[in-house]
Amino acid sequence: MSLTVEVDVMGTIVTLSLFHADGVDADRAKPYFDEAEHVLREVDRVFSTYRPESPVSRLRRGEMALGEAPPEVAEVLDLCREAREMTAGWFDPWAMPGGVDPTGLVKGWAAGRALSVLAAAGTDGALVNAAGDLASGGVVAPGQAFRAGIADPASPGTLAAIVELDGALATSGTYERGSHLLNPHTRVRESAVASASVTGPDPALADAFATALCVGGEAVFERLIDLDGYEALLIGFDGSQRLSPGFALVEASV
């Protein structure tokens, strides 16, 4: 049995879920849901580029030094540097117009922080779904792992694949918005594939890798398959799929 709370934050709906074989007590779960929501709202307050007075917006405009910003900003930018190096620059927040923009990693990072709060509730499992960025811990029920669907970018409302989830899943793609990702090497908004999904232990890095794969395609895929714990699924504009050897695909073309 499960209990789910929806939070309208970061320009999307984030779902917070707890799972337990004997059921989830709503009163006992409430403090964990409340704290997880607080974490998400604080991330939005600090990192939103749509809030003119957020620390990240002020940092981008040169009105605030990094040392004056909340410490989590430096933490996230360190992760961004790590992801930039691991993707050979295909993920590069410093290439964004208007100054450094860690948006391509923050949602996954926020999901991971919220999951850490929910995991302390002591249930069989916990799940955070931040509109394409999933962070999971534990199981749905004893012996039953989490599963997640990957949307078909060419057919809204249908699934291209189902994956067994142990940790994080991040998906980036064209979907309804078309090509919205900036190629950091050409500074042009373009995508190499229709969709890129990444599983792995760190929701923030999975988020960054999915973004990099979407714009870099095969060039990033070849680097990613050498990273311990991370797997990928690419869906081409023609519907073709390419999986890394360890991608936990349950079902394709659903």
Go through each PLM region and give its residues:
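Mature catalytic core of soluble alpha/beta enzymes
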Residues: 1-254
